[in-house]
């Protein structure tokens, strides 16, 4: 028996859950059922399996950074039962064939469920729309040009119209490329003293404003990826007040670290959007607390050691995060009073499911048995050398955190348990 947190029904109670044929068959106190295995979750939280709307699996084309196999192992270890893979691979996921390739390869692993997001434009070149309807028919739950924004507003508006017709969300990477001007970190006094070119908040905010306007015009469901600025929270709040179909996600690095935490010239602190100021961090935390910001996602972006072992100007943007997100969320948001444990479950499972129109993210009877068991008392240091991901590019190596995923169950199948790794819970 563990503390069940079900955001779908807003119930938190100590109950037993009985799984049969991959489904949640029964739930209640002191169930008497014949089971092949019993897991004692006393003292732990039992939550719906996490859903990550923002993962870079790098496959096809960049398998030296991550493979589908290593990516789903990392996801399972992080408590994820469903992840959305971004389309900026090689080739770009701009047609049904590549969507099917990823889905079949992920299914063969038998671990975390992978849903492949389709690109907005062919080759992500921003000039011609991809086969959006074909990709949706092949199983894409959403479209995104992640890694960049579609700068041709007329083309993007047309894509949003198609997305609305197909009843899928647009996952928006908001970055005005004309305002970046070679920036590699946030534009503030700290980074200026280091002689690094800065990325202003306006780079993100301008495109957020544009995309909200287009959502209003087209009726498309807009989901804003990796929001990092205080004004992003303000704009999302206003969009919701106006009744627009707008949701937003925040990543752990953006609600945990500011530019004051950066180790100078350490490329593991280089991501896009960049780390912002303390004021931005606090605004994001308050936005999550007040349920303005809906989702916690990772933007898991593995790179090789060689990739990152370059100057700040040359090294690629991105950090890994799928194995550290639960602990960081619990340590930085729950223990510090910004979120309740129920809100954590909501933002990591139920709300992401709603964004993509899925009925997952629930522990109700009859639902797929997608479950994560999370120990809220375990304190330890993050060790990048223990990652299942091929990527080791994290700014959190050595950081002391509280909270650990002990078991991940996907469709009734145990896909991760801590004891499998040889570690003691």
Annotate each predicted stretch with a short phrase.
Residues 2, 22, 43, 54, ...:
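Divalent metal-coordination and catalytic microenvironments
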Residues 129-296:
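Histidine/acidic residue-rich metal-binding segments in metalloenzymes
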Residues 96-113, 161-172, 324, 328:
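Alpha-helix-loop-beta-strand connector modules within alpha/beta enzyme cores
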Residues 311-314, 368-425:
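C-terminal cap of metal-dependent C-N hydrolases
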Residues 193-221, 268, 289-296, 301-376:
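His/Asp/Glu-enriched, well-ordered alpha-helical/loop segment
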Residues 1-48:
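Histidine-rich, glycine-flanked metal-binding segment
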Residues 41-106:
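Metal-associated gating/positioning segment near the N- to mid-region
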Residues 53-66, 87-89, 115-128, 195-202:
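Active-site mouth loops of central-metabolism enzymes
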């Amino acid at each position: 028996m563990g503390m069940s947190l079900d955001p779908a029904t807003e119930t938190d109670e100590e109950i037993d859950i009985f799984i049969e044929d991959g489904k949640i068959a029964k739930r209640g106190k002191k169930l008497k059922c014949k089971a092949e295995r019993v897991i004692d979750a006393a003292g732990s939280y039992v939550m719906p399996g996490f859903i990550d709307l923002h993962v870079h699996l790098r496959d096809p084309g960049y398998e030296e950074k991550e493979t589908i196999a290593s990516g789903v192992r990392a996801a399972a270890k992080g408590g994820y039962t469903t992840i959305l893979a971004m389309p900026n691979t090689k080739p770009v996921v701009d047609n049904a064939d590549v969507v099917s390739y990823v889905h079949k390869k992920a299914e063969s692993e038998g671990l975390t469920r992978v849903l492949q997001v389709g690109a907005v434009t062919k080759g992500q070149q921003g000039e011609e729309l991809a086969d959006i309807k074909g990709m949706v028919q092949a199983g894409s739950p959403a479209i995104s040009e992640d890694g960049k924004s579609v700068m041709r507003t007329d083309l993007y508006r047309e894509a949003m119209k198609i997305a609305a017709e197909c009843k899928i969300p647009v996952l928006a990477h908001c970055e005005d490329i004309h305002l970046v001007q070679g920036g590699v970190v946030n534009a503030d006094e700290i980074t200026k003293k280091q002689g690094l070119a800065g990325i202003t908040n306006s780079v993100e905010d301008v495109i957020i404003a544009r995309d909200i306007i287009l959502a209003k015009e087209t009726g498309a469901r807009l989901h804003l990826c990796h929001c990092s600025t205080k004004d992003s929270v303000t704009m999302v709040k206003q969009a919701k007040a106006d009744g627009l179909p707008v949701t937003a996600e925040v990543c752990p690095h953006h609600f945990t670290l500011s530019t004051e935490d950066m180790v100078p010239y350490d490329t593991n602190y280089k991501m896009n959007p960049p780390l912002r100021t303390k004021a931005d961090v606090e605004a994001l935390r308050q936005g999550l607390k007040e349920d303005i910001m809906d989702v916690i996602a990772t933007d898991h972006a593995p790179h090789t050691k060689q990739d990152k072992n370059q100057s700040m100007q040359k090294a690629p943007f991105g950090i890994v995060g799928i194995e550290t997100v639960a602990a960081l969320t619990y340590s930085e948001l729950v223990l510090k009073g910004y979120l309740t444990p129920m809100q954590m479950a909501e933002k990591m499972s139920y709300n992401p499911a709603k964004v993509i129109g899925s009925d997952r993210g629930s522990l109700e009877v009859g639902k797929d048995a997608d479950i994560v068991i999370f120990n809220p008392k375990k304190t330890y240091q993050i060790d990048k050398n223990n990652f299942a991901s091929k990527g080791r590019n994290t700014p959190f190596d050595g950081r002391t955190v509280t909270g650990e995923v002990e078991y991940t169950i996907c469709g009734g199948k145990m896909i991760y348990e801590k004891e499998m790794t040889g570690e003691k819970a």
